[in-house]
Curated annotation (Swiss-Prot):
Organism: Thermotoga petrophila (strain ATCC BAA-488 / DSM 13995 / JCM 10881 / RKU-1)
Protein name as it appears in the record: Ribosome-binding factor A
Pfam families xrefs: RBFA
Function description: One of several proteins that assist in the late maturation steps of the functional core of the 30S ribosomal subunit. Associates with free 30S ribosomal subunits (but not with 30S subunits that are part of 70S ribosomes or polysomes). Required for efficient processing of 16S rRNA. May interact with the 5'-terminal helix region of 16S rRNA.
GO cellular component annotations of the record: cytosol
Length: 131
């Protein structure tokens, strides 16, 4: 099996397991409905999993959410080790995913410049339907 393919499969499976574990986590400060693990990146030796977290809320709430998740990383690692057959369960490290926020800013800048990619896409689709 291609090592890159296996790594991608493991990252995807870890992401699914983390979402399951999040639902079982008992922390009243955590607003589970607004937390999403946008991506997981395994290190080459598969000992570390960097998990990027998207969260709807203020910057302070996002920072607090990442801190709460990092304090509970032992719980997440144990959950993964019980549900995934690996020699060593990876150490989990949570980070705020700023990619979505950055893409929204880029979109806003494009709109300010007079270019709206969403409207252009809709217009192209309408033109295709007319043909």
């Amino acid at each position: 099996m291609n090592p890159a393919y296996r790594k991608a499969m493991l990252e995807s499976e870890i992401q699914k397991l983390l979402m399951e574990a999040l639902q079982q986590l008992r922390d009243p400060r955590l607003k589970k409905d607004f937390v999403t693990f946008s991506r997981v990146e395994l290190s080459k030796d598969k000992r570390y999993a960097d998990v990027y977290v998207s969260f709807l809320g203020t910057p302070e709430e996002r920072k607090e959410t990442v801190e709460i998740l990092n304090r509970a990383k032992g719980f997440f690692r144990t959950f993964i080790s019980k549900n995934l057959r690996l020699y060593v369960a990876p150490e989990i490290r949570f980070y705020e995913d700023k990619g979505i926020e950055a893409s929204v800013k880029v979109h806003q800048l494009l709109v300010q410049l007079g270019y709206d990619p969403l409207k252009d896409k809709e217009k192209k689709e309408e033109d295709k339907e007319e043909e």
